[in-house]
Amino acid sequence: MRRHTNILILLLLTGLCISAGAQNNPYKIDDSLYPIFQRAIKWRTQPQGLLIADTLYAEATQKKDKKAQCLALTIPVSFYLSTNNYEKLEQAAARAKEEARKNNYLQYYYSACTNEINCLLNNGHSLRALQKAEEMKIQAFKDQHEYGIFSCIFTLGNIYYMRQNREVATEYYKNALEYMLKNLPDQDPTYMYINLSEYYRDKGEGEVALEYAEKAAKAAKTNESRVASLLNKCEVLYSMKRINDFNACYDECTQVIEQYGVIRKTAVQRLHIYKLILNKNYDQAHTEADSLRNLLSANQMHHEIYLKSGNYEKAY
């Protein structure tokens, strides 16, 4: 089942930073470190991102910027999540969690926990993911950490989604959104809105889906969440057959991706396929669909291509 559980939720919680340098950036780390972090984010799904993360960690250690150290360790977690390598991700997450707890930036502890669970879900291990979520819930309430509690609610939504109980999952997502808006006003609610948009899009309630998509785009606080919101909005517009609006959104999304790097590879590939379909480049669209790593997503796209090309025999 298609799902964007490979999201790395980049946090905007500031905490207490002891860096001596100026902090005129969204993450409140030393300004001299922020460009390095931006490069690491851009390349986090490529091996180069690991090297940049090492540089960031070393520089942050030298400057005694503990928050930047924690941020540096989110990059390997993101990389191994993107490559679906749970063994390596578990090792990277263990280091990230240890550093986060030592430096009292527990938001990054729970971010690492969430991504461990997401990787298990991506590999079809929903029962083990549920066990991990229960462990995270116990720790979050022990810490009385609001972001940790929110992460539990959100992650349980992901688990029920992957177990194909979308109604229960959607209730968790709505509860997570409500909790976030009430208790974590500085957090980025984009992905909550995206999840709800996807649910109503798949139910065929396009107008409701578009309403949530617009809220996601408006709420986006990071480059990553902005790209994610545009990708989702494009999907909604395509499903509603609003082709002119889709083309405009596609162009905007492409420009942002060129600027900030590829985020959510499968979603980007799907958009390329939609564009090829609209341009009647069906053979190329099939080739692109063959390159999708998720077999179910690939089959869905081939079905869409056959329908739009009028090849109903193969479509059904």
Regions picked out by a protein language model, each given a short descriptive name:
Residues 1-8:
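Bacterial N-terminal signal peptides that target proteins for export
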Residues 13-21:
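Hydrophobic h-region of N-terminal signal peptides that target proteins for export
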Residues 21-316:
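A "functional boundary" signal
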